[in-house]
Amino acid sequence: MAMSRRLVESPLVVASHNAGKVREIAELIAPFGLEARSAASLDLPEPEETGSSFVENALLKAHAAARATGLPALADDSGLAVSALGGDPGIYSARWAGPTKDFALAMATINHLLGDNPDRSAHFVCALALAWPDGHAETFEGRVDGVLVWPPRGDQGFGYDPMFLGEGAAETFGEMDPAAKHAISHRARAFALLVAACLGG
């Protein structure tokens, strides 16, 4: 197996226009002396997410940002997959919240579609793509399993966090303080793989 490329350059462009995601990634990379610059702060356009998987979409975003800035770029594509809905919303998780990013509406939609179905199992997936301006890229994927609760609980986190209760957890992702979420989340799991491969553990 080929060695992964080491990330030594800073700043790192976080190829996301989602402020919650950018903040979470900035907190995860800070201990490695890396500074995060958000795509929005660099006036980068949001590329069309035309991939058919989380990894494909993360790669699209990372390559676009690395090419535009001449800096290494980290992109995340993540979402919620609900078992009883055939894995939806999946890669369309953000789109279910509509143009105004109304996740309260998206959560209510999921709850409505589930109806009386007792199967509330779901999982979060996070794909991370780290791309360099020369076209090289590394990808990592993390997953966390759990169940959906209704009504949503907590105002920490973002997106679908308030309705997701991780396996063995007493608090939803929306109730956990950020440090607790960072320890077990799908993003943290993908990031741990990236750290081991590209930041020297």
UniProtKB/Swiss-Prot annotation:
Q: Which GO terms describe its molecular function?
A: dITP diphosphatase activity; ITP diphosphatase activity; metal ion binding; nucleotide binding; ribonucleoside triphosphate phosphatase activity; XTP diphosphatase activity
- Free-text remark on how the cofactor is bound: Binds 1 Mg(2+) ion per subunit.
> Can you supply one Gene Ontology CC term for this chain's record?
cytosol
Provide the residue positions that the database annotates as binding Mg(2+). E48, D77
Catalysed reactions, as listed in the record: XTP + H2O = XMP + diphosphate + H(+); dITP + H2O = dIMP + diphosphate + H(+); ITP + H2O = IMP + diphosphate + H(+)
Q: What is its EC number?
A: 3.6.1.66
- EC class of the enzyme, as a word: hydrolase
Q: Where is the active site?
A: D77 (proton acceptor)
Name its co-factor(s). Mg(2+)
Q: Which Pfam families match?
A: Ham1p_like (PF01725)
Gene Ontology BP terms: nucleotide metabolic process; purine nucleoside triphosphate catabolic process
**Protein residues bound to substrate:** S16, H17, N18, A19, G20, K21, S78, F158, G159, Y160, D161, K181, H186, R187
Superkingdom assignment: Bacteria
NCBIfam families, per database record? RdgB/HAM1 family non-canonical purine NTP pyrophosphatase
Share what the entry says about its subunit structure, partners included: Homodimer.
Job description of the protein: Pyrophosphatase that catalyzes the hydrolysis of nucleoside triphosphates to their monophosphate derivatives, with a high preference for the non-canonical purine nucleotides XTP (xanthosine triphosphate), dITP (deoxyinosine triphosphate) and ITP. Seems to function as a house-cleaning enzyme that removes non-canonical purine nucleotides from the nucleotide pool, thus preventing their incorporation into DNA/RNA and avoiding chromosomal lesions.
Q: Which HAMAP family did the record assign?
A: Non_canon_purine_NTPase
**Family as reported in the entry's similarity comment:** Belongs to the HAM1 NTPase family.
* Protein name per UniProt: dITP/XTP pyrophosphatase
Please tell me the species this chain comes from: Rhodospirillum rubrum (strain ATCC 11170 / ATH 1.1.1 / DSM 467 / LMG 4362 / NCIMB 8255 / S1)
